[in-house]
């Protein structure tokens, strides 16, 4: 989905919605039942319509075939995406609303007075869609975890601000650990991810109580 989205040039919110649909579908359907090579572009197609940034199905098929190359012929066509769209709608119970962490992220950064961390924290939120967090946690809790990680890495003291929040800090800690584990597991470039020697300090500074 990410690679295809880059080719057709859609907004990040469209990508996030498509990824969420993709993950939701496979909590109910198996990959043997619904081929992910067809589900992925269909989720992007559906998300682009829901987010009012419609991408034509023919463009999706064109770029997928281009990405696959001659050695790996992509057998699905436009009609397959349109047919799968109806199946996905049914699998999703026609519930297409997705609440993302982006809006609460901006609001919370403003409240904390650290809007200079917006770009860094936004990047962290983007990466959470490579995990299952959006299916498990409330969007604003994901936003808080990304703000916390960003504030520690950028040496911003947000301790008192976090203490004033009426949220379960254990949940924020759990989300932070999952994000950090993701970076550590996949050895993300320290320039855009998290250096290994930063992981323990981040977790140690996290308030343990709500």
PLM regions: where:
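C-terminal regulatory segments
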Residues: 175, 181-210
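Structured all-alpha helical bundle cores of eukaryotic regulatory proteins
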Residues: 1-180
């Amino acid at each position: 989905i990410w690679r295809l989205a880059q080719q057709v040039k859609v907004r990040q919110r469209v990508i996030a919605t498509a990824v969420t649909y993709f993950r939701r579908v496979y909590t109910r359907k198996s990959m043997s039942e619904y081929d992910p090579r067809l589900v992925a572009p269909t989720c992007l197609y559906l998300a682009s319509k829901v987010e009012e940034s419609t991408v034509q199905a023919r463009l999706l098929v064109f770029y997928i075939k281009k990405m696959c190359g001659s050695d790996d012929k992509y057998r699905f066509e436009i009609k397959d995406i349109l047919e799968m769209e109806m199946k996905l709608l049914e699998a999703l119970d026609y519930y297409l609303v997705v609440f993302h962490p982006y809006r609460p992220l901006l609001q919370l950064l403003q409240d904390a007075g650290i809007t200079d961390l917006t770009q860094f924290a936004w990047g962290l939120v983007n990466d959470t869609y490579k995990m299952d967090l959006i299916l498990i946690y409330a969007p604003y809790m994901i936003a808080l975890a990304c703000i916390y990680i960003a504030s520690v890495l950028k040496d911003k003291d947000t301790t008192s601000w976090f203490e004033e929040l009426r949220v379960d800090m254990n949940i924020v800690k759990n989300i932070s650990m999952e994000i950090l584990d993701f970076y550590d597991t996949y050895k993300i470039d320290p320039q855009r991810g998290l250096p290994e020697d930063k992981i323990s300090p981040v977790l140690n500074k996290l308030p343990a109580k709500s």
